């Protein structure tokens, strides 16, 4: 049930909660900047979860994830918009890995525990945003 609720909330936050107001109030250039920079706080949530659940053994993996998504966000902003599509799809995979491998992968990489339904929420949000970015990237690139 938590996953169904997570999916529904992810859809609501993505479409009427993010895409619609961003599209209405931001220019094409600002829209691209917004979606690029949004990757950074999204990745920060996992560091917060590490502290919240008191399992700092996963902190190194989460910091690496934060660095990767920050680099992807900056590359997308300054190089090619398609990188942003890849980044959001990769983040969806990152979310699913946290749900599936919450204990560890082969005992080598610890993963941060996440709230019930969070991976479903993020999967819906990230994939909807990735599809939207894909749809808009040509316009963004033409706008500069």
Please tell me what each predicted stretch does.
Residues 1-13, 57-64, 120:
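Structural signature of hydrophobic alpha-helical transmembrane segments
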Residues 7-26, 133:
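N-terminal signal-anchor/start-transfer transmembrane helix
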Residues 25-30, 49-59, 78-79, 112:
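Membrane-interface helix caps and helix-loop-helix hairpins in membrane proteins
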Residues 29-39, 60-65, 84-90:
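Cytoplasmic-side transmembrane-helix entry/capping segments in multi-pass membrane proteins
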Residues 37-53:
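Membrane-helix boundary elements
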Residues 42-47, 64-72:
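Hydrophobic, membrane-inserted alpha-helices
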Residues 85-103:
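Hydrophobic alpha-helical membrane segments
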Residues 98-144:
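C-terminal membrane-adjacent module
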